[in-house]
A protein has these predicted regions:
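Short N-terminal secondary-structure initiator segments
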Residues: 58-98, 144-179, 234-250
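Catalytic cores of enzyme domains
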Residues: 166-170, 177, 181-182, 186-393
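A residue-identity detector for tryptophan
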Residues: 20-23, 120, 142, 150, ...
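Short linear sequence elements within intrinsically disordered, low-complexity coil regions
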Residues: 38, 53, 69, 82, ...
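Acidic, low-complexity intrinsically disordered regions
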Residues: 16-19, 116, 138, 252
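Eukaryote-specific, low-hydrophobicity, charge-rich regions
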Residues: 93-186, 345
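Flanking helices and flexible, charged tails adjoining ferredoxin-like Fe-S electron-transfer domains
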Residues: 2-79, 86, 340-404
Length: 404
């Protein structure tokens, strides 16, 4: 009981700090932004928030302009006659360090990822955009954020003094998975916690990570970007927070270490290794059953578990030939080919192009809504087709080799 009370007090302090930081840092920007909107003017973000460290000589600058070289289209089933335009209501006169540089685009050696957005550090290179994002939240969005903050109070905590022995890690794994599903998870898997999953700001020393997914409301997702879609996503993230906290507490009650890891943790690499799906061209995970209609959560632990394996459902072959997300993205932020990022070749979304549109519209998510895999019932067919095509290519290559 005392542990729960201390956690509740910590949660109240966290919400108070967040609310005060939000109010004091963004009230002038919020007021001036509304005034500028009424006048039809752009607001200059350089005039707000704490100073941002200038990029060093030779470091690339952020370019927030959209990519106009890509053909545009709009999926007929999205709930918009047209997507919101890319005529932004703000500007930055002194460009800061590129978000792609922070992300490690073009780097051939591995390094841990670095925090880049949703940091609450407004002196960060992308801090001006984040300050605006926080400033223009609607009251409903702000309440939703506070509810999420409340859930963080039980992300960590004290473990029971007596440890439950685990003689059969396989049986324990099934129990933990069943409990996670009982709490509302649609997908769950276990992976070894590797260096690809941690950030410089949150080093973790656990052997395992439990990765899970909460299903998204597809109808709301098809309304993106909108307040409805944003509030629905916040509610879904609140669900991942609650499940993460409860599973972590359940493990700690057995005398083992466990920590809910939501912020500053690389959810997608963990989910890939746990067998939940594959990374798609739009930068999100694709699952055969759910497409990209889910939100991820994770728990790091030393509880002895049996790990799952990555899956191959044909996403890499499919995305190499598909253009749906690249052409539906209004600022065209999605690279059509894989990029080298921190020593790994992978699909990548241009952060400098994506995030201004995300901020302007209080969020986005068009790319995962239009993804063909997200249409119910199509995933298995896509997998079968890709595997058949792959087999034909292999047979053709073998025949050509024999005839050479």
């Amino acid at each position: 009981m005392l542990v729960r009370i201390r956690q509740d007090i910590r949660g109240l302090k966290q919400i108070s700090r967040t609310s005060w930081r939000h109010w004091t840092s963004s009230r002038k920007l919020r007021r001036d932004f509304r005034t500028a909107q009424k006048k039809g003017e752009k607001i200059v973000l350089d005039d707000y928030g704490p100073p941002v460290k200038k990029p060093e000589q030779g470091q690339p600058l952020a370019d927030f302009s959209p990519n106009l070289d890509v053909k545009s289209r709009k999926a007929h089933f999205m709930n918009h006659d047209e997507y919101p335009t890319i005529d932004y209501s703000f500007e930055v006169k002194n460009p800061t360090l590129s978000g792609n540089y922070i992300n490690g685009l073009g780097e051939t050696e591995f390094r841990p990822a670095r925090e880049i957005f949703h940091t609450w550090k407004f002196d960060h290179p992308l801090g001006k955009l984040e300050l605006l994002f926080q400033a223009i939240r609607t009251p409903k969005e702000w309440v939703a954020l506070c509810k999420r903050q409340w859930n963080t109070r039980r992300f960590t905590g004290e473990k029971a003094a007596v440890q439950v022995p685990v003689d059969d890690p396989g049986a324990m794994t099934e129990k933990i998975k069943a409990y996670t599903v009982e709490l509302g998870s649609a997908l769950v898997g276990v992976a070894p916690l590797t260096e690809d999953m941690v950030t410089e700001e949150l080093p973790l020393d656990y052997p395992y990570v439990i990765s899970f997914a909460v299903k998204m409301d597809r109808d709301a997702a098809l309304d993106a970007p909108s307040e409805l879609a944003g509030l629905t996503i916040q509610a879904e993230y609140r669900g991942t927070d609650q499940i993460s906290a409860q599973v972590a507490q359940h493990i700690r009650d057995m005398g083992w270490d466990a920590e809910a890891v939501i912020h500053n943790f690389m959810q997608i690499p963990a989910a890939v290794e746990a067998g939940l799906g594959e990374l798609g061209k739009h930068g999100s995970l694709i699952n055969q059953e759910l497409g990209s209609m889910f939100r991820l959560g994770a728990i790091a632990t030393n509880l002895p578990l049996v790990t799952d394996s990555p899956v191959d459902i044909g996403v890499q072959d499919f995305c190499a030939r598909c253009q749906v997300c690249t052409t539906n993205c209004p600022p065209h932020a999605i690279f059509d080919t894989k990029q080298m990022v921190r020593g790994r070749e992978r699909w990548y979304v241009n952060f400098d192009t994506c995030i201004p549109y995300f901020v302007e519209n209080h969020g986005c998510g068009i790319c995962i809504g239009v993804c063909p895999w997200s249409e119910p019932g199509r995933g298995e067919g896509f997998t079968l087709k890709q595997m058949a095509l792959r087999k034909k290519r292999a047979e053709r290559a073998e025949a050509e080799a024999e005839s050479a």
